[in-house]
Amino acid sequence: MSATVEFARMNGLGNKILVVDMRGRSDKVTPAAAVALNADPQTEFDQIMAIHDPKADGTDAFIDILNSDGSKAQACGNGTRCVVQALAAETGRKAFTFQTVAGILNAIEHEDGTISVDMGKPVFDWDRIPLAEEFHDTSRIELQIGPIDNPLLHSPSAMSMGNPHAIFWVDKDVMSYDLARFGPLLENHPMFPERANITLAQVTSPTTMTTRTWERGAGLTLACGSAACSAAVSAARTGRTGRKVKINVASAKPPAMLSIEWRERDDHVIMTGPAEWEWSGRLDPATGCWSRDDAREVEAQ
């Protein structure tokens, strides 16, 4: 095993996150290591958030994000909150600025332990989401699943929140749909040349929504922060809600809410929610071999 690094198993609303400290190193967590870690029931995850030394002035770190299949992700809101909690515990600071491949993220930990992340501006242009076909209005695109005359799902809102999202509006409980069956079909639909995150969204009031997500590169997930942001923005964009909503993530464990604001003054999306540390260890970023840090657990207790 090469020199190991510290990592923490965390979650954001049940979204399984591995936060890996790669600071001071020039190598990266490899796709092979990600696949190996996800194959182990003790370390299976939705995203890896690898913290690297900053590359840009005015930032605290560069965050490299991997999905459980080893592919790259551009954004992960729940994972970003986990990184903030980990670094706040380490440094005593509350505010951080991160660079990702999708851009700059600003985040702050509040006194109540919740964390707000400025996810930046949403993208609606069809060729920047991207979509395979030109749509003048991406708030409702032509896509459906099921019989032509009685589709199960149809006419999603499409956008990017650093990564591509399709939001399907439903009237029934989002848990009543077999998302595990048709999620992969929609994720890999030819309409999405870079694949897409697929979310079912039910508007329950002008200020509340319920969502469930099939995550690109990770599959059926307990929660997805960028999907919640995309659902909130798409709901406001189509007149279903206002710009401030509470998102009930239907499959989150434990049950919890995300607060999303699509800020009018600058169009930035602000996501606020919890993060939770579970346990820590060390891993080889090349192979995914790992060990648990029992001493840290005793200290935390």
Swiss-Prot record:
GO terms for biological process: lysine biosynthetic process via diaminopimelate. InterPro entries: DAP_epimerase_AS (IPR018510), DAP_epimerase_DapF (IPR001653). It is found in: Cytoplasm. Its EC number is 5.1.1.7. GO terms for molecular function: diaminopimelate epimerase activity. The record marks H165, E215 as: Could be important to modulate the pK values of the two catalytic cysteine residues. Homodimer. This is Diaminopimelate epimerase. It comes from Rhizobium etli (strain ATCC 51251 / DSM 11541 / JCM 21823 / NBRC 15573 / CFN 42). The gene is dapF.
